[in-house]
């Protein structure tokens, strides 16, 4: 009982002391005194001995009952464990989690002011702060925290930008009064600004807890104009109901206390897939803020948490189980190069003084100002460039230049900026006129007897560069060019005739390449009818995967310009015609075209020549069709070729997207007609013209000047995706491949003779969505003009001996090891080029049988010019089954090197002697000098290849070597390589494609 009396005396003493403090401060109130007396009386009643003596027996009974309930729970757990075989600890964990979920709740995650600032605070100030009114003045060094300040609502379907308040508006109005007559005491202690240490954004979402809506907010400091400095952090989270998403920002920023300070920080909100009703609120936001006042004589003292975590992280998102959350922040660090580039100027002087000019003559005059500049060897600042001529003359004698210490070095005369501008003139070529930027010019002859397939020009681009033109010497002696190359062609032919020309640029060609409209159109090309367009301008990016090129780049890489006739003269001219051409260095920056066969691009620039559509003059119905299996070989009934875009598309099984076509009129402008273009299947050819026009179609008409029309067919024109390659063994009606149909709508008529010819080119596929890895078809359908390839022109290869273990490998080649006379030589060897697939063997009387498998990956390696990244290879070795395991002595060794010469050392060596069957895996990393890309055996930079030299010991026991290849995730290609045509079966009786001997 004595302990209770002592505690009561202490409580009454503290209460009396607080009452005296209130009287001293003038805040004493009888109503407050009465309420506090009631509270103390209630506490005394609870702690009295009489009440405890009455409640003690009940407390004991409740504890016993609780213990009994625990025993019952344990019995139920044992029973459930016995009946359902559930471990007891699982049920215990569930019970504990349930009890914890009942007792705990999600709290604010913002750190307290004490965690951010360690500003000292006395006991008297803590007691005194309890009795300060809300309108008190914020002082320097005072730590403040505000919870649940309203921010605003995130409205669906609208651009949402909300201001993040730093403190409530009512307190801001008290700190910054509207009247200038407000009485302010102790001015030095009044806070002039606040340091915002932490801001927590809480989003109360109105959406369903099971929705998939996501969104985010960007925390912006609007006092900065540069986005690099303004955007402080960004967070992304799921906007679904239930637990409120929270994000912590640590601005670490001082904000001046004034009107409008709550408008400085803003949240820019966005939702990527919101299906909420427009105009309704997705969520409403509130903010928790922790800050510290800063005055003239007191600042803030950060804690270790603030220094080590808050300043380092800048932002932190609260992650909940089953919810995606992410946050990023940005820092714009200062770099010494900025001082070199922009400099720093200090101006002083220029004060106005009263100067005596003569007796009783005075005038106001401004003294000369001086400038001190801190800069390196960079360009002059914009401020110095805008100074007027008069001011510049005045400052000539008063300007002082201060260089940083590390830049004060003695420079040779040739390193001075003036000499550099005179000698290092690498950028002036592209800034001149067309006359001064012309580097080549000449004439090409088009014979009057030109027919389809006539090659007007096909040669190296370096051979066209002149020596006497104004821009040619400068171009030849410039190390780097970073802009496009522009071709200008002019010809004036009568409009009563017409001819179709194709101009193409390709990065490189093989020795026995084919020059026609199918091969030269794959990289950079344009279709031209001089009768419709007298002047043609054509720009290309010479380096498809790098930023620079030069004259030596043309000479040593084999860049090629080709011009061929794709449609003959509509009316034969009386003489040969000449095309005047000229080449200029353009001022447009280059664009790179890099492709990854494992990751489909959003836009695939196919640039595939679909063929010529020939319509006879008359009123009869005429229907033409072209298949859209763009991964197959392209050509006509005589030749077929593969190009880099075709090989890239063939890497996937199925495709769908928006197909963009270009229609070019190739005949005379006098021959006119209206065409309909639409998508349909092959079995729809039995429909009448009236039924065919019921398909969603596009009208194609040409004007007399341009002669071009563009047509697009989106995904809505296709029921589903279709195969990129179609087997020639499948009949046309069962291929399931959509066709581009072109139908004459009315009539084809003219006052002159001739057919109405239209060229069709597939430019690109937008929203390209392929799926599935395609190992390839041994029998691939060849696309023939106006029809699909028949079975008689199918492509055959040597029979496949084995298949890959998983469907991510492409077959490379197969070799049948010959039988040798072991008394003379006990080994056999062959070489395989891994980058440009070719096989070479030491015949010397041996019957080698080997073939390259026409898989999409092999075609991609052959037709792509530049390559970089990893390639994975697999060799399956199959021995002869009639050799006993105990008698097996055959070995296989693979030496991978950069070139076939003996002076090149091995990069990879693999050896095996396993009997009967084995598998060898290895990989190579292609890395070249052109932005990481490498060209096969190019003189430019002495670029090489990757060769695999295989030596077989005791080859009589060896049977078959089967090679496979697979691209790595970082493998990329660029540029088209014009290759030789594919060998069609039945012409030489070999039945192989192609065979290298």
From Swiss-Prot:
The answer to whether keyword Cell wall biogenesis/degradation applies is: no
- UniProt site (Interaction with the viral RNA): 430
User: Where is the region Involved in tubule formation by the movement protein?
Assistant: 370-376
Gene Ontology process terms (BP): symbiont-mediated suppression of host innate immune response; transport of virus in host, cell to cell
Q: Which GO terms describe its molecular function?
A: DNA binding; GTP binding; RNA binding; structural molecule activity
Record keywords: Capsid protein, DNA-binding, GTP-binding, Host cell junction, Host-virus interaction, Inhibition of host innate immune response by virus, Nucleotide-binding, RNA-binding, Suppressor of RNA silencing, T=3 icosahedral capsid protein, Transport, Viral immunoevasion, Viral movement protein, Virion
Residues flagged as site, Cleavage: 413-414, 800-801
Alphabetized Gene3D superfamilies for the sequence: 2.60.120.20
Q: Return the GO cellular component terms, semicolon-separated.
A: host cell plasmodesma; T=3 icosahedral viral capsid
Matching entries from SUPFAM superfamilies are given as: Positive stranded ssRNA viruses
Q: Which residues cross the membrane?
A: none
What's the name of the protein? RNA2 polyprotein
């Amino acid at each position: 009982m004595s302990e209770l009396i002592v505690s009561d005396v202490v409580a009454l003493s503290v209460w009396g002391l607080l009452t005296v403090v209130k009287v001293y401060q003038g805040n004493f109130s009888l109503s407050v005194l009465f309420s506090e007396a009631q509270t103390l009386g209630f506490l005394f009643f609870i702690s009295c001995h009489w009440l405890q003596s009455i409640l003690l027996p009940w407390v004991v009974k409740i504890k016993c009952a609780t213990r009994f309930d625990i025993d019952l729970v344990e019995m139920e757990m044992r029973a459930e464990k016995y009946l359902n075989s559930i471990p007891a600890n699982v049920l215990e964990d569930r019970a504990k989690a349930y009890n914890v979920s009942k007792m705990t709740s999600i709290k604010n995650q913002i750190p307290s002011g004490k965690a951010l600032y360690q500003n000292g605070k006395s006991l008297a100030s803590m007691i005194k702060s309890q009795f300060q009114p809300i309108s008190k003045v914020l002082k320097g060094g005072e730590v403040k925290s505000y919870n649940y300040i309203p921010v605003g609502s995130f409205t669906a379907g609208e651009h949402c930008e909300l201001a993040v308040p730093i403190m409530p508006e009512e307190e801001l109005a008290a700190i910054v009064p509207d009247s200038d007559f407000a009485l302010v005491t102790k001015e030095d202690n009044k806070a002039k600004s606040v340091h915002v240490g932490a801001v927590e954004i809480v989003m109360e979402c109105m959406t369903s807890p099971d929705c998939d809506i996501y969104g985010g907010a960007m925390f912006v400091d609007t006092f900065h104009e540069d986005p690099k400095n303004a955007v402080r952090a960004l967070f992304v989270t799921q906007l679904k109901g239930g637990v409120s998403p929270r994000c912590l920002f640590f601005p670490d920023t001082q904000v001046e206390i004034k009107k409008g300070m709550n408008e400085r920080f803003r949240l820019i909100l966005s939702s990527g897939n919101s299906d909420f009703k427009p105009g309704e609120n997705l969520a409403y936001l509130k903010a928790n803020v922790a800050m510290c006042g800063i005055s003239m004589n007191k600042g803030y003292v950060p804690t270790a948490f603030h220094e080590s975590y808050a300043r380092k992280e800048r932002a932190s998102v609260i992650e909940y189980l089953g919810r995606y959350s992410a946050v990023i922040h940005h820092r714009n660090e200062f770099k010494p190069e900025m001082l070199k580039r922009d400099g720093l100027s200090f101006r002083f002087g220029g004060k106005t003084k009263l100067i005596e000019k003569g007796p009783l003559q005075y005038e106001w005059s401004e003294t000369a100002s001086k400038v001190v500049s801190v800069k390196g060897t960079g360009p002059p600042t914009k401020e110095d460039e805008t100074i007027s001529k008069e001011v510049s003359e005045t400052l000539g004698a008063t300007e002082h230049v201060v260089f940083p210490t590390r830049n004060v070095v003695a420079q040779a005369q040739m390193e001075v900026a003036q000499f550099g501008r005179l000698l290092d003139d690498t950028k002036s070529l592209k800034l001149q006129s067309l006359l001064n930027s012309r580097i080549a010019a000449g004439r090409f002859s088009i014979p009057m007897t030109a027919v389809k397939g006539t090659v007007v020009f096909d040669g190296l681009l370096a051979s066209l560069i002149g020596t006497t033109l104004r821009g040619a010497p400068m171009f030849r002696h410039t190390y780097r060019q970073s802009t496009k190359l522009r071709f200008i062609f002019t010809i004036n032919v009568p409009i009563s005739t017409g001819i179709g020309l194709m101009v193409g640029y390709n990065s490189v060609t093989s020795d026995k390449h084919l020059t026609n409209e199918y091969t030269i159109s794959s990289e950079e090309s344009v279709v031209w009818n001089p009768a419709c367009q007298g002047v043609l301008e054509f720009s290309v990016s010479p380096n498809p995967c790098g930023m620079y090129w030069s004259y030596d780049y043309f000479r040593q890489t084999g860049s090629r310009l080709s011009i061929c006739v794709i449609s003959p003269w509509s009316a034969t001219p009386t003489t040969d015609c000449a095309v005047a051409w000229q080449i200029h260095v353009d001022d447009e920056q280059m664009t790179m075209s890099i492709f990854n066969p494992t990751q489909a691009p959003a836009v695939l620039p196919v640039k595939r020549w679909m063929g010529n559509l020939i319509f006879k003059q008359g009123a009869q119905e005429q229907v033409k069709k072209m298949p859209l299996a763009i991964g197959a070989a392209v050509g006509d009934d005589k030749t077929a070729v593969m190009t880099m875009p075709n090989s890239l598309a063939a890497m996937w099984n199925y495709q769908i997207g928006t197909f963009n076509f270009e229609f070019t009129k190739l005949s005379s402008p006098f021959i006119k007609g209206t065409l309909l273009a639409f998508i349909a299947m092959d079995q729809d050819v039995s429909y009448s013209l009236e039924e065919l026009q019921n398909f969603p179609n596009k009208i194609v008409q040409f004007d007399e000047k341009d002669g071009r029309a563009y047509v697009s067919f989106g995904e809505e024109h296709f029921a589903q995706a279709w195969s990129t390659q179609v087997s020639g063994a499948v009949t046309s009606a069962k291929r399931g491949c959509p066709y581009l149909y072109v139908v004459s709508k009315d009539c084809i008529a003219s006052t002159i003779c001739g057919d109405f010819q239209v060229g069709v080119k597939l430019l690109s596929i937008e929203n390209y969505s392929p799926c599935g890895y395609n190992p390839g078809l041994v029998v691939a359908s060849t696309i023939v003009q106006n029809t699909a390839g028949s079975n008689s022109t199918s492509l055959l290869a040597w029979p496949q001996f084995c298949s890959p273990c998983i469907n991510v490998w492409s077959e490379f080649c197969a070799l049948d090891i010959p039988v040798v006379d072991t008394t003379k030589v006990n080994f056999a060897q062959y070489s395989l080029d891994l980058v440009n697939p070719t096989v070479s063997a030491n015949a010397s009387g041996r019957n080698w049988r080997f073939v390259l498998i026409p898989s999409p990956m092999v075609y991609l390696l052959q037709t792509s010019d530049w390559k970089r990244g990893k390639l994975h290879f697999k060799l399956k070795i199959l021995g002869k089954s009639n050799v006993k395991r105990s008698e097996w002595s055959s070995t296989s060794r693979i030496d991978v090197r950069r070139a076939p010469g003996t002076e090149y050392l091995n990069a990879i060596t693999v050896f095996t002697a396993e009997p009967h069957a084995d598998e060898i895996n290895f990989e190579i990393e292609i890395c070249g000098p052109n932005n990481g890309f490498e060209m096969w055996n190019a003189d430019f930079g002495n670029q090489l290849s990757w060769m695999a030299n295989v030596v077989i010991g005791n080859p009589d026991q060896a049977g078959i070597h089967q090679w496979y290849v697979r691209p790595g995730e970082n493998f990329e290609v660029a540029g088209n390589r014009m290759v030789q045509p594919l060998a069609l079966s039945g012409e030489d009786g070999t039945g192989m494609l192609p065979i290298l001997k």
